[in-house]
């Protein structure tokens, strides 16, 4: 949603999306394309370019919160850290949250806890 051309594609204000939260994501599909999983996924270069958030960062983007767990697989941590770094490199507002003691599957539970650092960042993003 954050990379959609809302004005060009839908006639809406370019800033219709005011912020975004991404948790424990894969932001570049090239490692999957290069892995044995691609034998059944059939991800080609066009799909990598089209479906990788890291490769779709627009010039204008809403503030983002990128969260990941301390105990996640290294690849998920790397994806999150590199995506957050690339957003900042392009001068986009980005809050990076490394959640102590959590794994990939526990990250979704953080959205149900108003006191979690991830939800606190969400609240700050929307101004409450």
Model-derived features with residue positions:
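Primarily recognizes the serine-hydrolase "nucleophile elbow" in alpha/beta-hydrolase
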Residues: 1-38, 48-49
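A general structural signal for stabilizing positions within well-ordered secondary structure
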Residues: 11, 55-56, 88
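Loop/turn elements at helix/coil->beta-strand transitions in domains of secreted/extracellular proteins
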Residues: 16-18, 62-63, 92
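Acidic catalytic loop of the alpha/beta-hydrolase fold
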Residues: 29, 71-75
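Alpha-helical scaffolding within the catalytic cores
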Residues: 42-55
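Conserved serine/cysteine hydrolase catalytic core
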Residues: 52-61, 78-79, 110
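Short beta-strand/loop motif that positions the catalytic acidic residue
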Residues: 60-61, 65-69
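C-terminal catalytic histidine-bearing segment of alpha/beta-hydrolase fold enzymes
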Residues: 67, 77-84, 88-128
